[in-house]
């Protein structure tokens, strides 16, 4: 604001007063009108409240004017332009401008955007997860359905006569031990030793190559059998050959000894029933009842 003119300075009628120019920050639209230089005697008293030459604080308060009807009329408040703060959307031309209103709206929007607080990124989560949660080991669901009754013991069928197990594993006969030798090419057993010791393997080879295709298997495997075909021819050939190879006469006694050894070994090693003419079985008692060896009801 321009300092007010001191009252003590004398003014002459011929003095010419120039209206002070606005600040360099005044809008360009206000400077478009030419300034008129007036003499001091032509100045009116309505300019006493000029904001540019008088102090607004020293001006006396203007009371409300009264109209003819007696109702008080409020005096319009003079618009004062702040020299320090100048808004670019205020128009000094006095005509409405659409450009000024649009720029004012955009300026207000930018002002609100700057005044708004910055968004908080982690507002939803109070703190970041730094420790991986431990995996919960759940037991797999049993989709097989309800568990059935426990399996019965395979040795629960007992013979009524001897009280031994009647299952196939326990009741099957036990054979003499045997093994394969010479890179799994030769079977070493009691019966094989008898065949090679009495030269019966030579007779089996002759029967394998000289008999018909239908009978070669039975004659070669069982050369001394009386129920096979060509029984007389086989026995006649073995009798004539025993004159040259007398060891063939030891074949039958040696085979009998193997049968006896097989029966004795089976009696010692077979844990199950050896009864031949009985089919009656009984059910084994429960595992918890150790004293009861036989149930009351056979079937």
Curated annotation (Swiss-Prot):
The gene is SPRY4. Keywords: Acetylation, Cell membrane, Cell projection, Cytoplasm, Developmental protein, Membrane, Phosphoprotein. GO terms for molecular function: protein kinase inhibitor activity. The modification Phosphoserine is found at residue 125. Suppresses the insulin receptor and EGFR-transduced MAPK signaling pathway, but does not inhibit MAPK activation by a constitutively active mutant Ras. Probably impairs the formation of GTP-Ras. Inhibits Ras-independent, but not Ras-dependent, activation of RAF1. Represses integrin-mediated cell spreading via inhibition of TESK1-mediated phosphorylation of cofilin. It is found in: Cytoplasm; Cell projection, Ruffle membrane. Residues 166-273 form the SPR domain. It comes from Bos taurus (Bovine). Residues 50-79, 92-127 are annotated as: Disordered. One of its GO terms (cellular component) is ruffle membrane. One of its GO terms (biological process) is negative regulation of Ras protein signal transduction. Interacts (via C-terminus) with TESK1 (via both C- and N-termini); the interaction inhibits TESK1 kinase activity. Interacts with RAF1. Interacts with CAV1 (via C-terminus). The Cys-rich domain is responsible for the localization of the protein to the membrane ruffles. Residues 92-107 have a biased composition (Low complexity). Pfam families: Sprouty. This is Protein sprouty homolog 4.
């Amino acid at each position: 604001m321009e300092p007010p003119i001191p009252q003590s300075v004398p003014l002459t009628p011929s003095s010419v007063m120039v209206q002070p120019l606005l600040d360099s920050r005044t809008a360009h639209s206000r400077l478009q009108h030419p300034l008129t230089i007036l003499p001091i005697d032509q100045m009116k008293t309505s300019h006493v409240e000029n904001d540019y030459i008088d102090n607004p604080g020293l001006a006396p308060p203007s009371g409300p004017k009264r109209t003819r009807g007696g109702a008080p009329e409020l005096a319009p408040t003079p618009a004062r332009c702040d020299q320090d703060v100048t808004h670019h959307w205020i128009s000094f031309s006095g005509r409405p401008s659409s450009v000024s209103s649009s720029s004012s709206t955009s300026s207000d929007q930018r002002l609100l955007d700057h005044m708004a607080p910055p968004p908080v990124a982690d507002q939803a989560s109070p703190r970041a997860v730094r420790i991986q949660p431990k995996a919960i080991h759940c037991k797999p669901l049993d989709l097989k359905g309800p568990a059935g009754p426990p399996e019965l013991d395979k040795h629960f069928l007992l013979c009524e006569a001897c009280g031994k197990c009647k299952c196939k594993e326990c009741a099957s006969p036990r054979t003499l031990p045997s093994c394969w030798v010479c890179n799994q090419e030769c079977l070493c057993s009691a019966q094989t030793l008898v065949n090679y010791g009495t030269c019966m393997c030579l007779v089996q080879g002759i029967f394998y190559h000289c008999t018909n295709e239908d009978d070669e298997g039975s004659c070669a495997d069982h050369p001394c059998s009386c129920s096979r075909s060509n029984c007389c021819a086989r026995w006649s050939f073995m009798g004539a050959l025993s004159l040259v190879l007398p060891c063939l006469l030891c074949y039958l006694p040696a085979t009998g000894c193997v049968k006896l050894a097989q029966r004795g070994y089976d009696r010692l090693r077979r844990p199950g029933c050896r009864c031949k003419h009985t089919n009656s079985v009984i059910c084994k008692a429960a595992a918890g009842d150790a004293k009861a060896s036989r149930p009351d009801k056979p079937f």
